[in-house]
């Protein structure tokens, strides 16, 4: 009986039906739905309210991610050149030794939260590593479950324009040098994230973009499948 119930729920779920449709290699244009869980639109149908409706926006490319993040921040009235209280951000790397206030989480790649405090940006020169100044800011980040990461030292350039101030080699040198503080953490705005960052996570309401991108047919299918299955309740999908 339990298995029958699971099968019945799966058969009734438009999200599951769409994921199976995609796995079979069928185009989005041929998927039929009543709009209860899944709605599929074209680019010309996009309205601003879709961006604020979604718990998470997912796309394929960094160019699209940056475009959406800039647009959402503009609509929120946030200045483009500086972070704001309430900005949604995502960790780009694992920092297993950085533990949340309650001790429940480590700061991992893909961790998403909201800025609750940030300091004015400061500049320092790790002269043993690089002659170039590095802009940093101290930030507190609140997670969805209200746990917090406090006093995070963020790479300001990485967050605001998407370019890390240090190379991977320089970060390694800083983190392993007794002469320097640890390298600042790399974060990005997270109103939109790429599908690869979204893997393993799930949100109630997802806005997804199919996009045109230079991947083969099989990769495109895997992308759409992963995107679709990130939504647990409702999915709005924008066809390319």
Predicted regions and their residues:
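Conserved helicase motor core of P-loop NTPases
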Residues: 1-148
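C-terminal accessory regions
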Residues: 124-240
